[in-house]
C-alpha cells in the first residue's frame, strides 16, 4: 500500500493509510467487520483482538501483556478480571485505558474524502498501543459489543 492512500474497507469506512508497517490492524479491520455482522445474530457476543504491538507494549508494560476494553467490556470489568486472574496464575496483565483523545487522534482532518487515519500524524510513542485499539473500534463501530484488545510482546 503506497503511503497516504485512501482505501475503502468492508465496514464502509474510508481510511487514509500513512504507514504500511502497521499492516496488522488493516488486516484485522475486515475480520472485525465480518465478526460484527455475525455478532448481530448472537446472544451476548464477546470479541477479542490480539496484536503484538511490540514496541509500544514494551515501552508501556515491559514484559507484561496489556489489555484494553471498550465501554461494554469495562462495564463487565473484563480487563480487570483478566488482570486479577493473571495474578493468581503468575501471568500478569496490565490494564490500559482507551481514552477519548485516541479517537480524535485518528480522525482524518485533511478534508479530501478520508474519514480516519490508519496512523496519526507525527509520532505517538507515548500511547502507541491505545490509538490502534480506538482505530479498530471506530472503524468497525464495535462500541455496542464487548471488545477486548490485548497487546502482547
Language-model features: where?
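A generic structural signal for tightly packed, nonpolar segments enriched in small/aliphatic residues
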Residues: 1-153
Amino acid at each position: 500500500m503506497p503511503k497516504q492512500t485512501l482505501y475503502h474497507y468492508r465496514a464502509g469506512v474510508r481510511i487514509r493509510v500513512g504507514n504500511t508497517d502497521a499492516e496488522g490492524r488493516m488486516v484485522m479491520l475486515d475480520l472485525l467487520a465480518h465478526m460484527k455482522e455475525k455478532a448481530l445474530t448472537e446472544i451476548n457476543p464477546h470479541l477479542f483482538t490480539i496484536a503484538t504491538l511490540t514496541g509500544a507494549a514494551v515501552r508501556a508494560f515491559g514484559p507484561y501483556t496489556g489489555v484494553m476494553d471498550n465501554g461494554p467490556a469495562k462495564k463487565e470489568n473484563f480487563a480487570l478480571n483478566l488482570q486479577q486472574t493473571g495474578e493468581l496464575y503468575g501471568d500478569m496483565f496490565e490494564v490500559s485505558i482507551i481514552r477519548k483523545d485516541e479517537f480524535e487522534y485518528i480522525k482524518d482532518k485533511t478534508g479530501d474524502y478520508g474519514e480516519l487515519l490508519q496512523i496519526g500524524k507525527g509520532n505517538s510513542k507515548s500511547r502507541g498501543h491505545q490509538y490502534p485499539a480506538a482505530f479498530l473500534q471506530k472503524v468497525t463501530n464495535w462500541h455496542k459489543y464487548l471488545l477486548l484488545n490485548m497487546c502482547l510482546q
